[in-house]
Each structure stands twice: as C-alpha cells, then as structure tokens.
C-alpha cells in the first residue's frame, strides 16, 4: 500500500503499472499516467539543468536518492561525467559545510562516543541484515576542508553512491557511518543548527577503544569479509589505524591507498609519453600527509617491481611539508616521514626546493591553493622536455594550479592531472588538451566490487598496484595525445569491471578468495554481481493453469 511508495529501493513513482497500482492498493495515490524509466530520467535532468547552483543540484539528487533509489542510480549512470562532480568532489565539500543547515532526512548510521559499550546495539538499528561494504569517517579531515565533525556524513554517503554507480555494488548492502567523537571546529560548536556532539574531540585510549569496538561489532555482525573503508581521518590516526587493522580486518584507507593507486596509474600512463621508466624519475611531493606518503610507498613498490632495490627507490622521492623539505636530522619527524628523509640541507621555500632538486615529476597533495607558482611551472618546463605535474588536492579551490596555468606556463608540454575536474584548455597553437582527473573513483569501486564478489578477507597494498596497472592499461594512445592520463569517466563502470576481474583472478590463484566453487569465467561472474538499475518485479509471478484443471467441483460423488 501507501508505505511502498515511501521505500526508496522499491518505489517506481509513475513507472508502476496499472496492475501493480491496483494489486498494491496504491491506485489513486498516483496520477493516472504511466511513464518509462527513461522518461523519468529526462524529467530529472530537465529539473537538474534549470537549477543555478551545484549545491541546489546536489540537494535535488539527494532528494531523489531518498525517494527512488533505482532512478537515482539510473540518472547518475546516464552521464557519470556530469553527475559525479555533484554527488562527490568538489560539490560534496560544500554540501558537508552546509550539512547541518540543509539537513532533511538522516541517511546512514550515526554512532557517537557516548554509545561506547553499545555499538553492536546501534548497528542492530540498521534495517538491512546483509551489509558487505561500510564507509566510515570521524569527520576530522574532510577533503581539504578540515574538521567538520558530524557534517562529514556527506562523505560516506557520497562515496557509497559511487560504489554503486561506478562499481555496481548493491546499495542495499552498503552502510555509511559517522563516528562522532566531537569536533575542534569553533564555528560548529557555536552553531545552533549543528547536528553533532557539542564537545571537543575525544582522543587517546578512549578513542582507540571506541574504534576497536566498532571494528569488532561490524565484523561480528556482518562477517569478516565485510569491507570497511576508512575515509577522511586525520593524519595522526589514519596511518596507525591502517597499520593496526589492515591484517586483522577487511579494510583499507582510501585517502592513503586509493589516492596512491590513482596517482600511480596516472604516472604509469605518463611514462608512455616520456618514454622512460618509473625508476628514471625524480619525484617531489608538495605535502607529506596521508596522500603523499601513500603515493610514495606505492611508487616504491612499483619501482621494486621494475627490479630497483627499495633503498634506491626511496632516494628517488622527496617530500615537502609545512616546515619545508624533509631531510635527515630535521626535528620532530614522524616515523612515516623519516623513511623518506635524505641527506640535504634544510630548505623551506618550494620555489628554491624545485630549483635545487630538479624533479621530473611534481605532485601536489597539501591542499594549498596556487602552491605551484608561475616560477615553479616555468622551472619544471626548463628542467624537463615533458614535465609531469599533478595538482591532486581537492576541492578545486585547493588545487595547486589550474589546468590552464599548468599547460600555458609550460608551453603545452606539461603532462598534467588534477584531483578536481578542469575544463579543456586550448593552446595558442590551436591544440585542445583535456586534463586528466586523478579521481579515486577509478579505484575504490572496482576494489570494492572484487572484495564483495570473491569474499576477500584482507586488502593488500599489492591490490592497489594491480589496480593502478589496470587503469593505466585502459588509456589509449589517442587519449594520451589529447592529454588524458585516465580513461574517460563515462567508461568508469567498464574500468571497475576490469579491475575487479583482475583482482578476483589473482585472489583465486593465490587462494585468498573465500567464495567457492571457483567460477570458470571470472568476467561473467563479476558482471553477475553488479547492481541493475532496472525496476524490480514487485508482484508475485502470475501464470495460468489449463482450464480443465481449474474447474470447481460442485457435486459430491
């Protein structure tokens, strides 16, 4: 009846047939009109296009997700290049900043530090019994925007929307979670509309015990092969939690490993332009947080695969943090940074560092808008015939340089990629270049699909190198000529399928899969797991019997 039209994964709106409306007792609750899903998509797109701001477009799509889930994903998949920047970066950053103001309907699970000792009970409130993927954040480092506390829930929600749209993971089996331990954001603490706990962040043993309880509760309820993706945790927690849980649970950190994989994929594609090996590069990072260190470690692993000893590979990588170049003997270096500290004088100015190190590749992941100055870009072009310049920080306002500056200040010779989308750039020569967007969405949907499909218990760093290689293989020579270092976003579902197929194939070879019998056709097996946006048959299967068999007996023998 009426309640059915309020259940997002069952609601079809005006696509309910007359028979469905009559038998489900919703006839009369809908206008006397029957339209296809394709026409429904057209209506959404027309409404989308008449809105003036991306934030309003975001709200439109979120309302649709809360009303008609199949249609929401049909719309996203109809033009993923158009809709991804709305449901995820960069618009999701603005949405998180406005999350309390725009709050309409809760989506996901809100677990607070005051629920310690009862996390399992809170999980029981979730209506779905089968969950295969969880995305969790504590809201402390949302994109490049800092501590947004409970407002960070927009990130797990948006991330899981892309699990489905880009990877085909069933949305009914996905769970977005915010762990609310407080916030250090003064504006939020004073905001009467803020939806989270009004207290300073809990840290130390109490925080760790809370995380332990959460991980144990999720794995106990949903199984050891339930994927738990960590998202937007602060640097002080991200590395140690990954290290702590990686071999204990089915988990990964997208900010560290997902970013690393997509960045390395871009570098591997760039090497087809520079015509040399990864181990021939000198790589300088602006930033030394989760993203930079994750990329650096995966580059080392890729160089080792080329046959370069680990110690030699590490020497090819330099990092710059807020205090300057990371060198041996510098005070207060973390263990993670210490690994990439080299013998060199201390330097603070990025322009001077670039002139001194003369990198072949410059990678920005520090969320400092405009950090790649005109001088730096011109120097990169002076040192290299084809300089590799990746401005990977999100959102767009935090990008180290725009695509236009990246190309024009290097006479169009830069091999450029960014974290947020940029428009194509037409050079004075008339050539149009399409900057590659190093979006983690090339990575995590395929990895998640593979984990769900074959029941992986642990997600190793090797999986992310494999993923990078598969992504790079999907880039054609024509794409490279156009400046693209990544496959077109509109092929992302096919890319995810290829990633998942390769990971699943390796998992069965290495005996790490847990779902048996082993499928003979891995591609068909993975494809069969992918979510369909077609409306489900709601009515019971109806069929006829022979007329003779249906005769009603009226006389007693």
UniProtKB/Swiss-Prot annotation:
Q: What is its main location?
A: cytoplasm
Give the positions the UniProt entry annotates as the active site.
88, 159
Q: List cellular component terms (GO).
A: cytosol; mitochondrion
E.C. designation(s): 1.1.1.40
What does the record give under GO molecular function? magnesium ion binding; malate dehydrogenase (decarboxylating) (NADP+) activity; malic enzyme activity; manganese ion binding; NAD binding; oxaloacetate decarboxylase activity
* Site feature Important for activity, where: 255
Positions with a binding annotation for NADP(+) = 141, 255, 394
| Cofactor binding remark | Divalent metal cations. Prefers magnesium or manganese.
The protein's annotated catalytic reaction(s) are: (S)-malate + NADP(+) = pyruvate + CO2 + NADPH; oxaloacetate + H(+) = pyruvate + CO2
Report the Pfam families cross-referenced here: malic (PF00390), Malic_M (PF03949)
Q: What residues bear Phosphoserine in this entry?
A: 322
Q: What class of enzyme is it?
A: oxidoreductase
Required cofactors, per record?
Mg(2+); Mn(2+)
Q: Where in the cell is it found?
A: Cytoplasm
Residue positions annotated to bind a divalent metal cation are 231-232, 255
Please give the biological process terms from Gene Ontology that the record holds: malate metabolic process; protein homotetramerization; pyruvate metabolic process; response to hormone
List keywords of the entry alphabetically. Answer: Cytoplasm, Metal-binding, NADP, Oxidoreductase, Phosphoprotein
Summarize the subunit comment.
Homotetramer.
Protein family (similarity comment): Belongs to the malic enzymes family.
State the protein's purpose: Catalyzes the oxidative decarboxylation of (S)-malate in the presence of NADP(+) and divalent metal ions, and decarboxylation of oxaloacetate.
Instruction: Quote the protein name from its UniProt record.
Output: NADP-dependent malic enzyme
């Amino acid at each position: 009846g009426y309640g059915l039209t309020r259940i997002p994964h069952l609601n079809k709106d005006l696509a309910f047939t007359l028979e469905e409306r009559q038998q489900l007792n919703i006839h009369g609750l809908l206008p006397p009109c029957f339209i296809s899903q394709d026409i429904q998509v057209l209506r959404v797109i027309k409404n989308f296009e008449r809105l003036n701001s991306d934030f309003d477009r975001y709200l439109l799509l979120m309302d649709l997700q809360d009303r008609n889930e199949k249609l929401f994903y049909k719309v996203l998949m109809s033009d993923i290049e158009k809709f991804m920047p709305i449901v995820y970066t960069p618009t999701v950053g603005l949405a998180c900043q406005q999350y309390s103001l725009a709050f309409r309907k809760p989506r996901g699970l809100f677990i607070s530090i005051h629920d310690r000792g009862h996390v399992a009970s809170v999980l029981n409130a979730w209506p779905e019994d089968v969950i295969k993927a969880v995305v969790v954040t504590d809201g402390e480092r949302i994109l490049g925007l800092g501590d947004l506390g409970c407002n960070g829930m927009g990130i797990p929600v948006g991330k899981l929307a892309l699990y489905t749209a880009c990877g085909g993971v069933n949305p009914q089996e996905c769970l977005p979670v915010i762990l609310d331990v407080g916030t250090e954001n003064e504006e939020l603490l004073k905001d009467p509309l803020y939806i989270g706990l009004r207290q300073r962040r809990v840290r130390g043993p109490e925080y760790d015990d809370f995380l332990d309880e959460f991980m144990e509760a999720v794995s106990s309820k949903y199984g050891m092969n339930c994927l738990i993706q960590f998202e937007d945790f602060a640097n002080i927690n991200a590395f140690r939690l990954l290290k702590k849980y990686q071999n204990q649970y089915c988990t990964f950190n997208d900010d560290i490993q997902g970013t690393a994989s997509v960045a390395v994929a871009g570098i591997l594609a760039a090497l087809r332009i520079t015509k040399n090996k990864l181990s021939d590069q000198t790589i300088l990072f602006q930033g030394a947080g989760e993203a930079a260190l994750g990329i650096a470690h995966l580059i080392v692993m890729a160089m080792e695969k080329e046959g370069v000893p680990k110690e030699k590979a590490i020497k090819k990588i330099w990092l710059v943090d807020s205090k300057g170049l990371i060198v041996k003997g510098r005070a207060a270096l973390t263990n993670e940074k210490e690994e990439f500290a080299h013998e060199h004088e201390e330097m603070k100015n990025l322009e001077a560092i670039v002139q001194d190190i003369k990198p072949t590749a410059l990678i920005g992941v520090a969320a400092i808008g405009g950090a790649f100055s005109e001088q730096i870009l011109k120097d990169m072009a002076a040192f290299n015939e084809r300089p590799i310049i990746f401005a990977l920080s999100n959102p767009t306002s935090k990008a180290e340089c725009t695509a236009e500056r990246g190309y024009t200040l290097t006479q169009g010779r830069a091999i450029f990629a960014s974290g947020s989308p940029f428009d194509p750039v037409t050079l004075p020569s008339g050539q149009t270049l399409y900057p590659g967007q190093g979006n983690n969405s090339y990575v995590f949907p395929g990895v998640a699909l593979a984990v769900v499909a074959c029941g992986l218990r642990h997600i190793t760093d090797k999986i992310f190198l494999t993923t990078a290689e598969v992504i790079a293989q999907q880039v054609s020579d024509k794409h490279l000529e156009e400046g693209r270092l990544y496959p077109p976003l509109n092929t992302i579902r096919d890319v995810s399928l290829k990633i998942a197929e390769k990971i699943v194939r390796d998992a069965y070879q290495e005996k790490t899969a847990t779902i048996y019998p082993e499928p003979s056709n891995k591609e068909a097996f993975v494809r069969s797991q992918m979510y369909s946006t077609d409306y489900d048959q709601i009515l019971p299967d109806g069929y006829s019997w022979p007329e003779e068999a249906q005769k009603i007996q009226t006389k007693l023998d």
